[in-house]
Structures are given as structure tokens and as C-alpha cells.
Swiss-Prot record:
Pfam families: FMN_dh
Stored HAMAP family: Idi_2
Catalytic activity: isopentenyl diphosphate = dimethylallyl diphosphate
EC number: 5.3.3.2
Residues noted as binding substrate in the record, renumbered to the chain: 4-5, 146
Sorted UniProt keywords: Cytoplasm, Flavoprotein, FMN, Isomerase, Isoprene biosynthesis, Magnesium, Metal-binding, NADP
GO biological process annotation, one example: isoprenoid biosynthetic process
Gene: fni
Binding site for FMN: 59-61, 89, 116, 178, 203, 208, 252-254, 273-274
Protein purpose: Involved in the biosynthesis of isoprenoids. Catalyzes the 1,3-allylic rearrangement of the homoallylic substrate isopentenyl (IPP) to its allylic isomer, dimethylallyl diphosphate (DMAPP).
The protein's name: Isopentenyl-diphosphate delta-isomerase
GO molecular function annotations of the record: FMN binding; isopentenyl-diphosphate delta-isomerase activity; magnesium ion binding; NADPH binding; oxidoreductase activity
Cofactor(s) for this UniProt protein: FMN; NADPH; Mg(2+)
InterPro entries assigned to the protein according to its UniProt record, in alphabetical order: Aldolase_TIM, FMN-dep_DH, IPdP_isomerase
Length: 329
């Protein structure tokens, strides 16, 4: 487990997708704004809760000493900036009660913390996770292609829908169904919604590629490195569901303009993984805190130029699609 978790960090920083769909969407500038910069409101609402800022540090790691070091850096950044942090899958701690890589309130007691578990795990383990972590919400991740590419991965999937229904009805905190960089299709969202899930992180292709990571760990299926749909493609495909479910976006988000494009396409909030991981691995924590705080001001600047006071108003912004996105239905 430890080596696999460390491999994930190592290879996540190496791969760069040859295509980023955010470059194929262009927002229409407004020349006569209605609001002052000081009027702009970054707050958002999802999973039954209000949040001051519309982006969060998404699930990445844990379960090793390297993972602990990364998590502690991320926790300090999240606490200092007031954004939510989601830990990586809690499965390592369930297997090893001595694992302390998730005990992040000891690092930052004011941390807004959520956590993550795989849908292959029965609901009893999800309940244990919530009891031990006391998270704001629980992400339940689906990663079928990653599992199939892992020599030690799961091969039994018929229980997943049953597990999901049980998570939706038996977990005492909000449950978010999360992809892991392959993108979530509309039919899966509809099915999960029917099973009781209201909030989805569609986590599209464009950032961390677990197909690439598993291939680097010894696989030979590099032709699957770019499997799945991009975040923008998933958001476009899910337009008809935006009034029925809550959509969060992650995957390939590089900067505040990419975040804004997600909000324009209906996302309630945006998760960042690799972008933040690169920062904490490259810079001192204080500088990363300054960068993340800077993102808040940059979001306000872009929103002001788009004549939008709130995140919700961004859904009314006009945009142009180019390249591959012109083919998305």
C-alpha cells in the first residue's frame, strides 16, 4: 500500500495530457459592467452546506510517510486560506489503525476537512471512516478503469450499485460521488441520483491520469493513458441535469480562468489536485498560501469583467466552443 501511494504522488507530477479542453472554450467579455469589484461574492452552496470560497483541495493522498508529509502541507494551506481539503482514500487507515497520515486537525485545528473512500468498500467501512474522521462530507470514489489496470486492483464490480444505495441512505454526512479523472457520464449520474445521490464531482480527464500512473507502475497499456472524457465535455453533456443535481468539477483545472469556465458550465465548486500538489512540492508553504489567496482575487477580477456578482450568475455567461468541443452534444 505504501509504495503504491507514493507511486501515485510520483507519477501524478510527471504526466501532462496532450489536450486540455479548457483551451477550447472562450468566454464573452462584457464592456459595461454593473458591479464594483468589491461587490463580487465568491460564496457557494453544495452538499447541504455554505462555503465561503468555490474551490477546494481535492482528494490526493495518505497512507504513507510521503503522503503524510504532503497532507500536512496541504492542510496548512487549506486552513490558512479557509478552503476545504479532502484527504485521499481513507482505506489505508482502515487497514492500519496506526496510520497517522490523515490526522490533520493536529496540524491545523481550524481545518475544514472532508475525506474519501472507494465504492468497493461496504457501507460499514464508510461509517467507520465518518466516525473516525468527522468530515464535512464523504467523497465516494469510482475508479473502474484504474482498478482494471492495477495488477492488484478490484475485479468485482457488481456490488457497487448496492453499496452506493447504502451509502446514500446510511452515511450521516453528505455523500458526494466522485470520479478520479476519467469523467462521469450522464447515465451514471442519473442512475446514482435514482439511488439517492445528490452531489457529483465529475472529475474529468485532463489532470491526474490514473491510467498513466498504473501503466508507469508496470502496465503496458499506454494507449489508455487518455481514457475518458474531459471535465469540460462532462459539464457540457450534463447541462440537462443541472437543475436536478449538484455538479462539482475537477480534472485539469490549472488556474482561476479554468475555474470560472467550470462555473459558467454549471459547476457549484471546483476541486484542484495536481495543481496544488505541484505548488506544495515546489514552494514553501507560505508562498503557496499567498498563491491560493491570490486566486480568490483573480476570480473576482474575472467575474467583474463578466458582469457577474455571484457564482450562480456565471451560468448566464455566453461562450464560444472550438475544436473538439464543437462535437459535444
Amino acid at each position: 500500500m505504501t509504495n503504491r501511494k507514493d507511486d501515485h504522488i510520483k507519477y501524478a507530477l510527471k504526466y501532462q495530457s496532450p489536450y486540455n479542453a479548457f483551451d477550447d472554450i472562450e468566454l464573452i467579455h462584457h464592456s459595461l459592467p454593473s458591479y464594483d469589484l468589491s461587490d463580487i461574492d465568491l460564496s457557494t452552496h453544495f452538499a447541504g452546506q455554505d462555503f465561503d470560497f468555490p474551490f477546494y483541495i481535492n482528494a490526493m493522498t495518505g497512507g504513507s510517510q510521503k503522503g503524510k508529509a504532503v497532507n500536512e502541507k496541504l492542510a496548512k494551506v487549506a486552513a490558512a486560506t479557509g478552503i476545504v481539503m479532502v484527504t485521499g482514500s481513507y482505506s489505508a487507515a482502515l487497514k492500519n489503525p496506526n496510520d497517522d497520515s490523515y490526522r490533520l486537525h493536529e496540524v491545523a485545528d481550524n481545518l475544514k476537512l472532508a475525506t474519501n473512500i472507494g465504492l468497493d468498500k461496504p457501507v460499514a467501512l464508510g461509517q467507520q471512516t465518518v466516525q473516525e474522521m468527522q468530515p464535512l462530507f464523504l467523497q465516494v470514489h469510482v475508479n473502474v478503469m484504474q482498478e482494471l489496470l492495477m495488477p492488484e486492483g478490484e475485479r468485482v464490480f457488481h456490488t457497487w450499485k448496492k453499496h452506493l444505495a447504502e451509502y446514500a441512505s446510511q452515511i450521516p454526512v453528505p455523500v458526494i460521488l466522485k470520479e478520479v479523472g476519467f469523467g462521469m457520464d450522464v447515465n451514471s449520474i442519473k442512475l446514482a441520483h435514482d439511488l439517492g445521490i445528490q452531489t457529483f464531482d465529475i472529475s474529468g480527464r485532463g489532470g491526474t491520469s490514473f491510467a498513466y500512473i498504473e501503466n508507469q507502475r508496470g502496465g503496458d497499456r499506454s494507449y489508455l493513458n487518455d481514457w475518458g472524457q474531459t471535465t469540460v465535455q462532462c459539464l457540457l453533456n450534463a447541462q440537462g441535469l443541472m437543475d436536478q443535481v449538484e455538479i462539482l468539477a475537477s480534472g485539469g483545472v490549472r488556474h482561476p480562468l479554468d475555474m470560472i469556465k467550470c462555473f459558467v458550465l454549471g459547476a457549484r465548486a471546483v476541486g484542484l489536485s495536481r495543481t496544488v500538489l505541484e505548488l506544495v512540492e515546489k514552494y514553501p508553504t507560505e508562498r503557496v498560501i499567498a498563491i491560493v489567496n491570490g486566486w480568490k482575487e483573480e476570480l473576482k477580477i474575472i467575474m467583474c469583467a463578466l458582469d457577474c456578482k455571484t457564482i450562480k450568475e456565471l451560468k448566464g455567461v455566453d461562450y464560444l466552443l472550438y475544436g473538439r468541443l464543437q462535437q459535444v452534444n
